[in-house]
């Protein structure tokens, strides 16, 4: 049986968890094996900017941060299960990558 690795990436961990729960329900309904969701390391993008735009005065900095959360889900690539995975409602800020392995 083929395996499918589904990688979920996004900035909102709650929405990623919702998509993971939908994948779990699909696996339960179709009776295929599911492994995960495995949390991968969170990537932090930090951008420091000067508070004063003119360059005069005290050098104070603001730090803006964007966190990118990732989850990995493994599922058997059964035809019925994969059709239902393709129909999952995915929010705008969550991206999905599906990789099939033999």
Swiss-Prot record:
Gene Ontology terms: cellular component: small ribosomal subunit
GO biological process: translation
InterPro entries reported in the protein's UniProt record: Ribosomal_uS10, Ribosomal_uS10_CS, Ribosomal_uS10_dom, Ribosomal_uS10_dom_sf, Ribosomal_uS10_euk/arc
Alphabetized UniProt keyword annotations: Ribonucleoprotein, Ribosomal protein
UniProt cross-references to Pfam families, sorted A to Z: Ribosomal_S10
Family: Belongs to the universal ribosomal protein uS10 family.
Function: Involved in the binding of tRNA to the ribosomes.
Name of the protein this chain belongs to: Small ribosomal subunit protein uS10
């Amino acid at each position: 049986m083929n395996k499918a690795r589904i990688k979920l990436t996004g900035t909102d961990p709650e929405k990623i968890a919702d998509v993971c729960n939908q994948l779990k329900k699909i696996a339960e309904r179709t009776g295929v094996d599911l492994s995960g969701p495995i949390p991968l390391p969170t990537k932090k993008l930090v951008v420091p900017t000067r508070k004063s735009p003119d360059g005069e005065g005290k050098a104070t900095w603001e730090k803006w941060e964007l966190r990118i959360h990732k989850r990995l889900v493994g599922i058997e690539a059964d035809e019925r299960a994969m059709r239902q995975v393709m129909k999952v409602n995915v929010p705008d800020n969550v991206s999905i990558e599906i990789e099939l392995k033999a």
